[in-house]
């Protein structure tokens, strides 16, 4: 049925010709083949080389279709391609297929934390590493064993998701999560900086995502947003750029690692406002109430040095809260002996 041969014949009976396609749950493309997995049959399929309409061509050549039965328990939860491998996930298993033709295709299975149910669309490749949501949190797979990258997040809020959607831009992993139903539904947009290992939570505007290589577009059900508006030539006419985004940064406890004969005598913050911003700097001593230290305003790009002398305490935390865009460039601590005199050097 490839159109290379034409024949005519007359038959008294009706002749039916069909080209069957397996009933598959998840698909991915790898090496000019479409790969898919079937939960009904527990089978992984590959189409004929370069022909996604032909799944049962077995002529003994390198372009043949391919199928293999897997022995792992449970349903498939996702599929992806990374570093030349076709990958198929279950919640506790990773199946990896590699090879150049059906005669040397090999299946390798690994018992590990796989893709969570309902999180098939969280799979996203960034800089040769595959990120996805597992039942235990967000994982990163670089070709060996998946490692957890979401230890800084509350694991309870990453479990039992209804749906998860992933996207990427400039080394950042965008993860949109939906948990619960109706009024109890909780929606979050998490962003992971893969180079710095930092997580942040952004305003939700991404029920759907699509990347173009140099931009990530997010659909909120009413409008399309660009993750980086500066890359859009006509963003000013769009009338929808976000400005004055609210932010809040709270540090961990400072001073718990100091020996008893030293105390924190001075703390200096160096801040840089990227755009028009309002900033409030506050401090909390020994987990007490927040006390405002300074309120800053920037009409554009500007740097601030905020020094202050903390009162004697066991530990303190500081908070940066405001609206706009702010970067904490450095944190300098100065310690002194209990009897006076500066001893320690700066620590950034």
Give residue spans per PLM region.
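Generic detection of intrinsically disordered/low-complexity segments and helix-coil linkers/edges
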Residues: 3, 29, 49-52, 60, ...
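Hydrophobic or amphipathic alpha-helical targeting/insertion segments
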Residues: 1-13
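A broad, low-specificity signal for short, low-complexity segments enriched in glycine/proline
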Residues: 1, 46-51, 55-57, 93, ...
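Beta-sheet repeat architectures centered on beta-propellers
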Residues: 114-121, 125-129, 135-348
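Beta-propeller and closely related beta-pinwheel folds
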Residues: 11-165, 198-200
């Amino acid at each position: 049925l490839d159109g290379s041969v034409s024949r005519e014949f007359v038959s008294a009976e009706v002749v039916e010709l069909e080209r069957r396609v397996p009933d598959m749950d998840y698909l991915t493309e790898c090496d000019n083949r479409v790969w898919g997995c079937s939960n009904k049959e527990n089978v992984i399929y590959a189409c004929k080389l370069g022909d996604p309409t032909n799944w049962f061509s077995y002529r003994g050549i390198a372009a043949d279709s391919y199928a293999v039965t897997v022995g792992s328990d449970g349903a498939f939860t996702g599929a992806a391609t990374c570093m030349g491998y076709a990958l198929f996930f279950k919640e506790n298993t990773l199946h990896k297929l590699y090879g150049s033709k059906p005669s040397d295709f090999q299946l390798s299975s690994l018992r590990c934390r796989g893709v969570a149910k309902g999180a098939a669309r969280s799979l996203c490749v960034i800089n040769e590493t595959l990120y996805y949501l597992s039942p235990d949190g967000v994982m990163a797979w670089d070709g060996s064993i998946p490692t957890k990258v979401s230890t800084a997040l509350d694991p309870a809020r990453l479990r039992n998701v209804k749906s998860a959607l992933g996207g990427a831009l400039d080394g950042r992993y965008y993860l949109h999560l939906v948990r619960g139903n109706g009024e109890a539904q909780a929606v979050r947009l998490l962003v992971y900086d893969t180079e710095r290992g930092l997580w942040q939570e952004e305003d939700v505007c991404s029920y759907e995502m699509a990347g173009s290589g140099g931009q990530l577009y997010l659909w909120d059900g009413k409008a399309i947003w660009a993750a980086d508006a500066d890359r859009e030539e006509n963003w000013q006419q769009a009338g929808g750029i976000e400005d004055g985004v609210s932010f809040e940064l709270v540090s961990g406890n400072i001073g718990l690692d100091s020996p008893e004969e030293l105390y924190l005598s001075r703390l200096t913050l160096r801040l840089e406002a990227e755009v028009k911003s309002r900033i409030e700097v506050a401090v909390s001593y020994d987990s007490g109430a927040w006390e405002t230290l300074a309120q800053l305003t920037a009409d554009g790009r500007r740097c601030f040095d905020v020094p202050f002398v903390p009162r004697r305490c066991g530990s303190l935390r500081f908070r940066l809260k405001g609206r706009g865009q702010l970067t904490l460039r450095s944190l300098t601590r100065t310690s002194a002996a209990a009897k006076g005199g500066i001893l320690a050097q700066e620590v950034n």
